[in-house]
Amino acid sequence: MEKFTVLTGIAAPLPMINIDTDMIIPKQFLKTIKRTGLGKNLFDEMRFLEDGAENPDFILNKAAWRKATILVTGANFGCGSSREHAPWALLDFGIRCVIAPSFADIFFNNCFKNGILPIALPQVEIDKLLDDAGRGSNATLTVDLENQVIRGPDGGQIAFEIDAFRKHCLLNGLDDIGLTLQKGDKIDDFERTRAMSSPWLPIAKAV
């Protein structure tokens, strides 16, 4: 998993509440188990018209926000089904940070496991960031995970909270597999000890 330390980029304002996972990545695109290739269908029903053409009114189709890496949005983001394809689609599009007043629990947890930083802030601070994001490519936000602050284009700072363990995992690029591999020596020691104390177990397992 790619490390998350400091992210400076364009923020796209999407001030909608209750954006569910089917809006993030519709069900017809869930047949794949690959984490790549889903970005082109992110927010598919909002980004594209019925004839397949881009919706010119959708924020990510506008020139100033096409390369957004930060999303500032409304409350209860990621509600609905537990599909992990939702953070996959965001990440594949290029979104590394989502800032909202609140998140659905499962989506919130899945973000951390896929290298995306979800930040929950009071609505008054979201409103300020939405205003900043509305400037498009003329203004960028900087998300500093180590110091737990968001810096706006005017030099102002907004502090945010994050669980210490999740912060450690993002800073070091550790997903569940990465965390397990850190214990590789201990796992190998256990397997050697088990093979000597219970030599029949590997044979029984093979059968």
UniProtKB/Swiss-Prot annotation:
Belongs to the LeuD family. LeuD type 1 subfamily. CDD domains: IPMI_Swivel. The lineage of its organism: Bacteria, Pseudomonadati, Pseudomonadota, Alphaproteobacteria, Rhodospirillales. The keyword Isomerase does not apply. Keywords: Amino-acid biosynthesis, Branched-chain amino acid biosynthesis, Leucine biosynthesis, Lyase. GO terms for cellular component: 3-isopropylmalate dehydratase complex. Catalyzes the isomerization between 2-isopropylmalate and 3-isopropylmalate, via the formation of 2-isopropylmaleate. Heterodimer of LeuC and LeuD. GO terms for biological process: L-leucine biosynthetic process. It comes from Rhodospirillum rubrum (strain ATCC 11170 / ATH 1.1.1 / DSM 467 / LMG 4362 / NCIMB 8255 / S1). It is an enzyme of class 4 (lyase). It holds the Pfam family Aconitase_C. GO terms for molecular function: 3-isopropylmalate dehydratase activity. Gene3D superfamilies: Aconitase, domain 4. It catalyses: (2R,3S)-3-isopropylmalate = (2S)-2-isopropylmalate. The keyword Zinc does not apply. HAMAP family: LeuD_type1. Pathway: Amino-acid biosynthesis; L-leucine biosynthesis; L-leucine from 3-methyl-2-oxobutanoate: step 2/4. This is 3-isopropylmalate dehydratase small subunit.
